[in-house]
Structures are given as C-alpha cells and as structure tokens.
A protein has these predicted regions:
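Catalytic cores of soluble, metal-dependent hydrolases
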Residues: 1-87
Length: 87
C-alpha cells in the first residue's frame, strides 16, 4: 500500500520492533513477519513532504546479535537524514 500524502511537515518515529527479527534481533518485542530493511528504505524514499525530525526507538543492545540492529538503526538514520536534507 502507499503512504498517505501529507501537506504539513513530517516527523518520523521509527520503532525497531517493527522490523522482522532477521534484520533487527536487538529489540525487546520481536515481530516475526515484520518489515525488511528494504521495505523501510522504500517507504522513507517515497515520502514527498518535508521531513523536519526523527527518532529511532525500541533498540535493546542486550538482545542485539553482533550489533546487527545497531548498524540497521544507523543505516535507517542515514536514510532519514538524507530525506531531511532534500529541499
């Protein structure tokens, strides 16, 4: 499905629990069948309105395997910052 079209500036809150555990094991509440990293990148890149801020939540380093989730969170923040830099 498509992202709704927004007319006002957008704040993104990315919950790491929403990713499939294959991509994001370091969370408190894993969601089997969750989103892939590619799906989330596609969603971020498809945003057509101004992004004014963001946060990433629900990272649990005690459950992270080889820092997979930390690296994924950093990649997602890079994508979001890239979107914020668009004029």
């Amino acid at each position: 499905s498509k992202i709704p079209r927004f007319n006002n500036p957008l704040y993104i809150s990315l919950d790491m629990d929403g990713f499939d555990p294959a991509f994001s094991p370091g969370v408190s509440h894993p969601e089997p069948g969750g989103l892939s990293s590619r799906q989330v990148i596609d969603i971020i890149q498809s945003i057509k309105t101004e992004v004014i801020g963001a946060d990433i939540t629900e990272y649990n380093p005690d459950r992270d395997f080889q820092k997979m989730t930390a690296f994924l969170a950093a990649k997602m923040m890079k994508e979001i910052i890239g979107k914020m830099m668009e004029k």
